[in-house]
Amino acid sequence: MSHNDTIVAQATPPGRGGVGILRISGLKAREVAEAVLGKLPKPRYADYLPFNDADGTALDQGIALWFPGPNSFTGEDVLELQGHGGPVILDLLLKRILTLPGLRIAKPGEFSERAFLNDKLDLAQAEAIADLIDASSEQAARSALNSLQGAFSTRVNHLVEALTHLRIYVEAAIDFPDEEIDFLSDGKIEAQLNTVMADLDAVRAEARQGSLLREGMKVVIAGRPNAGKSSLLNALAGREAAIVTDIAGTTRDVLREHIHIDGMPLHIIDTAGLRDASDEVERIGIERAWQEIEQADRVLFMVDGTTTSAVDPADIWPDFIARLPAKLPITVVRNKADMTGETLGLSDVNGHSLIRLSARTGEGVEDLRNHLKQSMGFETNMEGGFLARRRHLQALEAAANHLDQGKAQLLGAWAGELLAEELRLAQQSLSEITGEFTSDDLLGRIFSSFCIGK
């Protein structure tokens, strides 16, 4: 497949609807307009026309929009046909267009890919299109739109420009060592480097917020049978998502709920009670529970407050704690406070968070919601914020590491050449976000996750 091909795809969701849109982009778009419409519409005006078959009979009628390149979404000639949204009608029209030479069905995300390749969008903006479509909350949608409008890219580009200026200064000091002013030791480079590092830290903090909005937080509820795990899932979900009985081992498989806390997506996972099980089905459920625990962002360790007064997880169940991944955050949830009379609320026990609540009555559950939000550093007021993906966080972290290494070289040995190289690598890491330095393989993976007509 070539980027010189003319591509066509349905731009509206499959199925029946009031309107169905076909989008065509490429050199042959003009020929499609003349063949199907009988004329070339006036650029950027809505023209109501019949959509004709090869023999001149009308297949449909609707709005035609003509956007000659480079003033179009893709930067190429683009034709949009907006007809009726019946799948049969759209299929007939699509088949008609594909009878013309030089046209093919677009790959997923190929329209956005062409916009990127033709400098209509950078890579972060192109990704924001998919994120806007997939947004699961109002806040996520607003942040995705900010990214599409360039909020994230602008911040990254400012960092790249600052690094470029700093590299020029450092390399001038290297190339002209006999000058009276020692650029490397006069403090100016260190001051500029500190400014860039502080700006990068601010962008990283906002990117983590944006990643939380997009990816969400995976929270696994784990503990012994009958500790109240399913009751807590229901309390957090606000509905009867799980069956709750007094019979130990009622939950035998993984249950998932997706909720939002002040805009932050939360993936809650209820698991089978952990114990030595002789029943094969329950044993499989317990193994699945451990698989989810190992992939969690946080574990809610449910404890039946009527069975123990211990609050330290190592005292409550040392074998469970020993099996957990080393850096996995734990919140001990002492349940059934309505029966024990314990004081509700959050406290700290040996570096672990402890919360007392009643999953049955809902008392203390709001404290848990706030704790989950705060534990991830999530801020509800993100006006002007942007969405970020995991690869963006990795690129920002790589850039920060290179700047740390560069500063160490500057302060330790006044090694200008090594500092300049670390600045170059940091600049390259940041440029991967916007696509200035990005492999073709990565581009393929990114755009293949898009909708067909985007």
From Swiss-Prot:
This is tRNA modification GTPase MnmE. Binds 1 potassium ion per subunit. Homodimer. Heterotetramer of two MnmE and two MnmG subunits. Residues 216-377 form the TrmE-type G domain. Keywords: Cytoplasm, GTP-binding, Hydrolase, Magnesium, Metal-binding, Nucleotide-binding, Potassium, tRNA processing. The keyword DNA repair does not apply. It is found in: Cytoplasm. GO terms for cellular component: cytosol. (6S)-5-formyl-5,6,7,8-tetrahydrofolate binds at residues 23, 80, 120, 454. Exhibits a very high intrinsic GTPase hydrolysis rate. Involved in the addition of a carboxymethylaminomethyl (cmnm) group at the wobble position (U34) of certain tRNAs, forming tRNA-cmnm(5)s(2)U34. GTP binds at residues 226-231, 245-251, 270-273, 335-338, 358-360. GO terms for molecular function: GTP binding; GTPase activity; metal ion binding. Its main location: cytoplasm. Its cofactor is K(+). Mg(2+) binds at residues 230, 251. One of its GO terms (biological process) is tRNA methylation. NCBIfam families: mnmE_trmE_thdF, PRK05291.1-3, small_GTP. Its EC number is 3.6.-.-. HAMAP family: GTPase_MnmE. K(+) binds at residues 226, 245, 247, 250. Belongs to the TRAFAC class TrmE-Era-EngA-EngB-Septin-like GTPase superfamily. TrmE GTPase family.
